[in-house]
UniProtKB/Swiss-Prot annotation:
GO CC annotations, alphabetized: cytosol
GO MF entries: DNA binding
Example of a GO biological process term: regulation of DNA-templated transcription
Family to which this protein belongs: Belongs to the TACO1 family. YeeN subfamily.
Pfam families linked: TACO1_YebC_N (PF20772), Transcrip_reg (PF01709)
Taxonomic lineage of the native organism: Bacteria, Bacillati, Bacillota, Bacilli, Lactobacillales
Record protein name field: Probable transcriptional regulatory protein SSU98_0387
Length: 238
C-alpha cells in the first residue's frame, strides 16, 4: 500500500505541475468551500483542507487567492456535486465525482466519455458498494510503529500504517482524518504529500496490453473533463 500511494503521488504531481486544468478544478473547489462558509481558512476547516490539498498538488498561490476573492464577491454562481459510476475493461470499475454549474452538461459528457472509450455507465451504487471511504495521509518518515502509537494515543481509529521507501502511509476512518492530521502536526510533522478522503477498493485488478491501453484512454478522457474533480478505481497503479 505504501509503495502504491508513493507512486501515485509522484505520477500525479508530475502531471499536475504542467496541467492548468488541475488548477482550474481546485479553483472551483476552493471557491465552493469559501462560499459555503467563512472565506478565511483559519476559521473554515473545510476551506483549509482544500487549500492544503491544492498546495500538495502544486497549485500556485495566485490561483488559490483568486478563488477566495471570487467567493468574497457578489457572484451567485452555484455548483452542484455529483457522482457517476461505471465499468471499464476486464473487471475494472470507476467512480467519478463531479462539481459543476451545469448538471446536464456534465452528465452528458461523462456518459460520452464512457461510451466512446470502451466503458459502460452503471446505475448509482453499482460500483461504490465495492469501495470503502477512508482517510489517507502520506508523508516522509520511516517509523510506522511510532506513528501508529501516536495516533492511538490521540484516539484516532487506524486501519493501517505502513513505512516503505522513506514514506509513511496511513489509512484510517474518514471521520478521523482531521483528527489524525491535527495529531501529526502537534507531533511536529508539518509537510504532507497526501491528505485525502478516498474511495478505496476492497480488491484490485491488474490490467495489461490492450485492456490497460483502453482503460488509460477512458481514465484520461474522464480526467480531462473540467467538471470532474476526482476519479476512483480498482485498477492497480491508478
Amino acid at each position: 500500500m505504501g509503495r502504491k500511494w508513493a507512486n501515485i503521488v509522484a505520477k500525479k504531481t508530475a502531471k499536475d505541475g504542467a496541467n492548468s486544468k488541475v488548477y482550474a478544478k481546485f479553483g472551483v473547489e476552493i471557491y465552493v468551500a469559501a462560499k459555503k462558509g467563512d472565506p478565511d481558512p483559519e476559521t473554515n476547516s473545510a476551506l483549509k483542507f482544500v487549500i492544503d490539498r491544492a498546495k500538495q498538488a502544486q497549485v500556485p498561490k495566485h490561483i488559490i487567492d483568486k478563488a477566495i476573492d471570487k467567493a468574497k464577491g457578489n457572484t451567485d454562481e452555484t455548483f452542484v456535486e455529483g457522482r457517476y459510476e461505471g465499468f471499464g475493461p476486464n473487471g475494472s470499475m470507476i467512480i467519478v465525482d463531479t462539481l459543476t454549474s451545469n448538471v446536464n452538461r456534465t452528465a452528458a459528457n461523462v456518459r460520452s466519455a464512457f461510451g466512446k472509450n470502451g466503458g459502460n455507465m452503471g446505475a448509482s451504487g453499482s460500483v461504490s458498494f465495492m469501495f470503502d471511504k477512508k482517510g489517507v495521509v502520506v508523508f516522509a518518515g520511516d517509523d510506522a510503529d511510532a506513528i501508529f502509537e501516536l495516533l492511538l494515543e490521540a484516539d484516532v481509529e487506524v486501519d493501517d500504517v505502513e513505512a516503505e521507501d522513506g514514506t509513511i502511509t496511513i489509512i484510517q476512518l474518514q471521520l478521523d482524518l482531521h483528527k489524525a492530521i491535527v495529531a501529526l502536526k502537534e507531533s511536529g510533522i508539518q509537510e504532507f504529500n497526501v491528505t485525502e478522503l478516498e474511495m478505496i477498493p476492497q480488491s484490485e485488478v491488474s490490467l495489461e496490453g490492450d485492456d490497460l491501453a483502453t482503460f488509460e484512454k477512458l481514465y484520461d478522457a474522464l480526467e480531462d473533463d473540467e467538471d470532474v474533480q476526482k476519479i476512483y478505481t480498482n485498477v492497480d497503479g491508478f
